[in-house]
Amino acid sequence: MACCSTSFCGFPICSTGGTCGSSPCQPTCCQTSCCQPTSIQTSCCQPISIQTSCCQPTSIQTSCCQPTCLQTSGCETGCGIGGSIGYGQVGSSGAVSSRTRWCRPDCRVEGTSLPPCCVVSCTPPSCCQLYYAQASCCRPSYCGQSCCRPACCCQPTCIEPICEPSCCEPTC
């Protein structure tokens, strides 16, 4: 039976044998689809126990977990913490900007299966950061790094990931 162990920014990854905390791990740890019914999800394989509905506060909000850049409805409350939070100071005026929690679907990053979570940023993340965060493309923005890898950069499009040899952001 698949099990989860903590790795890569604290998120669970799939392994075999052992336990997850004090409970046996469930095969749903390795689920790859995003919008699964909450009845088959287990708290054992979730990063936080209250994140059990794949960023969908209610059953009628079914598009929140789809790979779209601008779908924000329901995401602020679906990932465990509602509202926005302060994000330091901007410029010399001392104005405080506001970070918003954007939903990110389930995807593979650095060869690791990650459950759905939220990207916290001041502006809407690009699809590259939000959905196509892959080792060969962009760094995972939810780990505090939003710049692209030097090898290639995904274009911020919701249709298909397009990689180019040059990076849109050469430095972090």
Curated annotation (Swiss-Prot):
Location of N-acetylalanine modifications: A2
Keywords: Acetylation, Keratin, Repeat
Miscellaneous note of the record: The source of this keratin is lincoln wool.
Presence of the UniProt keyword Repeat in the record: yes
Sequence repeats: 27-36, 37-46, 47-56, 57-66, 67-76
Domain of life: Eukaryota
Annotated source species: Ovis aries
Coiled-coil region: none
Function: The keratin products of mammalian epidermal derivatives such as wool and hair consist of microfibrils embedded in a rigid matrix of other proteins. The matrix proteins include the high-sulfur and high-tyrosine keratins, having molecular weights of 6-20 kDa, whereas the microfibrils contain the larger, low-sulfur keratins (40-56 kDa).
Xref: Pfam families: Keratin_B2 (PF01500)
The protein's name in its UniProt record: Keratin, high-sulfur matrix protein, B2A
One GO CC term, this protein: keratin filament
Keyword Repeat: yes
